[in-house]
C-alpha cells in the first residue's frame, strides 16, 4: 500500500446513500487520498482537516454503468476525454462485454 501525504478531507452534513438499500442518513465522511476512513453521524474535525459542509447535498458511492459500449474508447490514446463526462456524472465503473464481445479483453 502506498503512503499518502494528502490532507484529510471531512465532508460534513451530507445526506448519505451508502449503497446498501438502507434509508439515507445525514452524516459525515472522512477521506484521505483515495480512501474513505470513516462514515458516521458526526465526526469531530481536527485542525489539519479540510472541511466542506455538504448541507442540502447528497453523497453516494460511484455508480456502475451495467450497459455501455465505452470499452471501445479504452483502446484510444486520448481515452480520458471520453470517460471524463461519465466521472462527472458519478459513474466510476463500466461493465464491458455485456453484448457478448469486448474490444478490451478480459483477465483470468
Go through each PLM region and give its residues.
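Hydrophobic alpha-helical membrane-insertion segments
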Residues: 27, 74-76, 99
